[in-house]
């Protein structure tokens, strides 16, 4: 009987511990940050902590961008504000049903393709990117972008 009683006490304590934890703690910290952010936002939305529509989420992006600018001017923690901005943009992606991790990966791949194209264009001119001005590199970037849109 004592063993059974101890077992029941342990189970009650476990159950209390489970109910004392936050709804959001069930989202794994080992997930890539953008996936984790979307899951956290989705869980928060399930209990009603959400904007009624995407316009509220977009306004939050603008607010967070202003906070990044202020932090860069010495009025705050830049890293924290950039994190808040990324989190807010991720929330917009959740609203419009875009996987933020996949969107970021696609953008990284696009950047690599366009940069490689810039390098090839510079090489065709007998130059290295490091020898070009920012304006010249911007022109190569625009050309790489146009090529992608034509393909």
Features from the language model and the residues they span:
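Flexible "arm" and connector segments at domain edges
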Residues: 1-82, 86-151
